[in-house]
Design a protein with these regions (language model features):
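N-terminal nicking endonuclease/strand-transfer module with a His-rich metal-binding environment
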Residues: 1-201
Length: 201
């Protein structure tokens, strides 16, 4: 199993199983700038040009499901996004099958119905994010009643962190646990070999 150094969860031998619903025609930045120019929007240096959403479910939900069933799940999820965001603004929708749990990365240009560039109006604050999550769950549970609503950030008080940082934290915790396990079993007879194992980590 070959792994990316930046993302140890990726199994490159399964990357050919990934699939697109929306394939980017150019770089995200270039596509966003094109749509923004066509809409006649003015931008600032700190304007959000692309919003990324991550769509998934628990590993248990996907367990035993065939590729066609997984694809159907994400098509239904994409339908929800299209109900609330103009389809032409969706510049990429790709399902990753090469990690532990199938998930879809979806990117769109945050253009409002009246042609403004405003991620704040679309995604907004924590309250608006909670609304998106609630409405998404209501949509999905119509077809998949076994799905449970995840904990809302507005209830837990936890801050959202990007997937990359979350994965790095999980990886570091895993390394810490391995090191502690090796150290706990270290004695004068195996100290050198244990030190070598820790260095390899």
């Amino acid at each position: 199993k070959e792994k990316y150094a930046s993302n140890p969860d990726v199994d490159t031998s399964r990357s050919n199983r990934n699939f697109h619903f929306v394939t980017p025609q150019r770089s995200y930045r270039a596509e966003a700038e094109k749509q923004i120019a066509e809409a006649g929007c003015r931008t600032r240096s700190d304007s959000v040009r692309v919003v990324e959403a991550l769509v998934t479910a628990s590993p248990e939900f996907f367990k035993g499901k065939k590729r066609a069933e997984i694809k159907e799940y994400f098509i239904y999820a994409l339908d929800f996004i299209k109900e609330h965001q103009a389809e032409k603004t969706i510049i990429s929708a790709v399902v990753h099958m090469d990690e532990k749990t199938p998930h879809m990365h979806l990117c769109f240009v945050p253009l409002t119905e009246d042609g403004r560039l405003s991620a704040k109006d679309i995604v907004g604050n924590r309250k608006k994010l909670t609304w998106w999550q609630d409405e998404f769950w209501k949509h999905m549970v119509k077809k998949y009643p076994e799905l449970e609503r995840g904990e809302s950030a507005s209830e837990t008080g936890r801050e959202h962190i990007p997937p990359r940082l979350y994965k790095e934290a999980v990886h570091l915790n895993s390394l810490r646990d391995k090191i502690m396990e090796l150290l706990s079993g270290t004695n004068p007879l195996n100290a050198r070999s244990r030190a070598a194992e820790i260095e390899k980590l």
